[in-house]
Amino acid sequence: VEPILKENGIPDDFKYLMVIESNMNPTARSSAGAAGLWQFMQGTGRDYGLEVNNNVDERYHIEKATRAACRYLKDAYAKYKDWVAVAASYNAGQARIASQLAKQDVDDSLDLQLVEETARYVYRILAAKQLFNAPTTFGFRLRASDLYPPIPYTEITVTKGIADLARFARSKGINLAILKNMNPWLRETSLSNHSGRT
């Protein structure tokens, strides 16, 4: 996530927006239907280039969803020229923040009167940053053994459909459960790939 944010000129602190959106769970799903690390709704995901259908749901694809989030954040920044307003718009929507900035005639988005959830949103991002950057200050004592080790993986480019993902997984020396755990955007036991995307 961090290299993709950097590559797109998005401030590194926006990784904490992802933390509060999904608790860094790539398979997170809200009761409203938002999904993945960045909690895209289906329509917004499609608007920002993600494939969402019964076979594939790229909202669960860590890299592609992060790139889509960067496009969203850059679009919002082009409107507001203010990263705090951008963060608030991720929660409230770009149209709502734009209308409130105009209606309330304020120069600083922190001065906006917003619904409680959105008003707290930016501060939740800042709180997550503080916790991650100084855990011992808040009573968290983490040892290296408490952390998840990096998971070894092999990246494979697929440009056509796969009729049987279980057989495909076996041919790569793993099973279907591991394949789908590492690729939660795969929704079925086959991959049609009608779009020809990689």
PLM region spans:
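Export/targeting segments at the very N-terminus of extracytoplasmic proteins
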Residues: 1-23
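Alpha-helical scaffolds flanking conserved acidic
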Residues: 11-18, 35, 83-88
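Solvent-exposed coil/turn segments that connect beta secondary-structure elements
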Residues: 22-23, 43-45, 130
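Extracytoplasmic and endomembrane cell-envelope/extracellular-matrix remodeling and assembly machinery
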Residues: 1-2, 7-8, 47, 52-55, ...
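Short, surface-exposed glycine/acidic/tryptophan-bearing loops
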Residues: 27-49
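Alpha-helix N-capping/helix-start residues
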Residues: 11-12, 42, 176
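A general structural motif at alpha-helix termini
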Residues: 18-21, 41, 90, 182-183
